[in-house]
From Swiss-Prot:
InterPro entries: Acyl_transf_WS/DGAT, CAT-like_dom_sf, O-acyltransferase_WSD1-like, O-acyltransferase_WSD1_C, O-acyltransferase_WSD1_N. Catalyzes the terminal and only committed step in triacylglycerol synthesis by using diacylglycerol and fatty acyl CoA as substrates. Required for storage lipid synthesis. Upon expression in E.coli functions weakly as a triacylglycerol synthase, making triacylglycerol (TG) from diolein and long-chain fatty acyl-CoA. Has no wax synthase activity to produce wax esters. It catalyses: an acyl-CoA + a 1,2-diacyl-sn-glycerol = a triacyl-sn-glycerol + CoA; di-(9Z)-octadecenoylglycerol + (9Z)-octadecenoyl-CoA = 1,2,3-tri-(9Z-octadecenoyl)-glycerol + CoA. GO terms for biological process: biological process involved in interaction with host; glycerol metabolic process; response to hypoxia; response to nitric oxide; triglyceride biosynthetic process. GO terms for molecular function: diacylglycerol O-acyltransferase activity; O-acyltransferase activity. Pathway: Glycerolipid metabolism; triacylglycerol biosynthesis. Pfam families: WS_DGAT_C, WS_DGAT_cat. This is Putative diacyglycerol O-acyltransferase Rv3371.
């Protein structure tokens, strides 16, 4: 038996008593070729799923094997109406997100989506966020592939490793400091969220119905921005997301403020960060640098193993409370995953695309997840069904945010400070001073 981490227990408790969808995440792989028969799928999935312990287990305070596991209770099969384009695929994804996972069974589902144009089909994996401590939905997809290599989406090698703590006394002192620190930070965030006027929140009552959309960005374009400014791909993604939400606020006639929007990021470990997105800045470079600096500061304050040292119920109650805040509290969960090390294949067929599905819950009106696959960085976006207009504004803003950064990453572009003095290249990391020309930018799939 394996225990939950403190943070994942909190995500599990975010499911409400009426069994609305809890914090579920997912990924969709678009596969070349005709969809296999149900018998073929059942044979392959049964063999591969049973090799992944979490997929045949249920949990309370720890993971235990589920008696009488039946694959057919977890697999759904749907066919898209003609023309089978991406708009129809996105509707099918949204439909899958509206269906809650059964908490009395292993917390995952697989949807086989047939009828995509171009002789293609798709497989959607949805898992509860409490399983993500062991694997993400993208990891699970990789484990189902022909090479069964769960490390296909493994973490980047440059991720900082947290050294183990020493004696029991230092561990206890660290535990106390972290508990007090995270409690204060989250309680402060909750207090601020409740006090924010509703007019500043991405709006309207939250429903169980969802919309899904994706924005694709050439990975070379993102790499050019990273190279120019000495930042990470995750920084670029968050800066683009910031522009997206700034666009929404301006479209509503609201003035973006420094405390307008906060995002919950679950890191590669078991911790979470709650940084503000700098929507108040119009300058895309200033936004990018602010995101980068805040991410670095959050990383220094919160080691990956932080919430594993936090008392279980304390952390669980915090996440539970955060999920129940009004919409203006936390309106987005931004997550990311590194690109796979090679192209994936399923039942002999090539995976053309992988689309991320952000954490989805009744209390969260908007979610964005970011995933790199092949030569693309993909933003997956979910929103309330009634928020179609604002979702399009968000998409447009993300596209604009990437386009502006790509344009500024060209060496022929001179960067100026606010008083029109040229920005010194010495202010940039060495990697930024070796910038390279930009390449074509974002495109949305509607």
């Amino acid at each position: 038996m394996a225990q939950l981490t403190a943070l994942d227990a909190g995500f599990l408790k975010s499911r409400d008593p009426e069994r609305h969808p809890g914090l579920a995440i997912g990924a969709v792989a678009v596969v070349n070729g005709a969809a296999p028969s149900y018998d073929q799928l059942k044979t392959v999935l049964t063999e591969r799923i049973k090799s992944i312990p979490r997929c045949t287990q249920v949990l309370a305070t720890e993971w235990i094997d589920y008696p009488g596991f039946d694959l057919t209770q977890h697999v759904r099969r749907v066919a898209l109406p003609r023309p089978g384009d991406e708009a129809e695929l996105f509707r099918a994804i949204a439909l899958a997100l509206e269906r809650p996972l059964d908490p009395d069974r292993p917390l995952w589902e697989c949807w086989i989506i047939e009828g995509l144009n171009g002789n293609r089909w798709a497989i959607l994996i949805k898992i509860h966020h409490c399983m993500a401590g062991a694997m993400s939905a993208a990891h699970l997809l990789a484990r189902l592939c022909d090479d069964a290599d769960g490390s296909a989406f493994a973490n980047n090698v440059d991720i900082k490793q947290i050294p183990p703590y020493g004696d029991a006394r230092s561990w206890a002192e660290t535990l106390w400091r972290m508990s007090v620190s995270i409690a204060g930070a989250v309680c402060t965030a909750a207090a601020r969220a409740v006090s924010w006027p509703a007019v500043t929140s991405p709006a309207g009552p939250v429903t169980t119905r969802r919309r899904y959309q994706a924005v694709r960005v050439p990975r070379d374009a993102v790499d050019a921005v990273c190279h120019k400014f000495g930042v990470t791909a995750n920084d670029v993604a968050l800066a683009a997301i910031t522009e997206g939400f700034r666009t929404v606020l301006l479209h509503r006639g609201q003035q973006p403020r420094a405390d307008s929007l906060r995002t919950l990021e679950k890191t590669d470990g078991s911790s979470a960060m709650l940084p503000y997105l700098p929507v108040e800045y119009d300058d895309p470079v200033r936004r990018l640098r602010t995101v980068h600096n805040r991410s670095q500061q959050s990383g220094r304050r919160q080691p990956d193993s932080l919430s594993d040292y936090t008392p279980l119920m304390l952390c669980a109650k915090m996440i539970h409370a955060l999920a129940r805040l009004p919409q203006q509290g936390i309106v987005t969960l931004a997550t990311s995953a590194p690109r796979p090390r090679h192209q994936l294949r399923l039942m002999g067929q090539k995976m053309d695309q992988v689309l991320p599905i952000p954490p989805t819950a009744l209390q969260l009106s908007t979610g964005i997840a970011v995933l790199s696959y092949g030569d693309e960085l993909v933003f997956g976006i979910t929103a309330d069904y009634d928020a179609a207009s604002e979702m399009q504004q968000l998409v447009n803003g993300i596209e604009l945010g990437v386009a502006r950064l790509v344009a500024l990453s060209d060496d022929s572009v001179l960067l100026f400070t606010k008083d029109r003095r040229k920005r010194s290249s010495r202010a940039l990391p060495s990697a930024a001073r070796r910038g390279r020309p930009s390449v074509p930018t974002a495109r949305a799939r509607h």
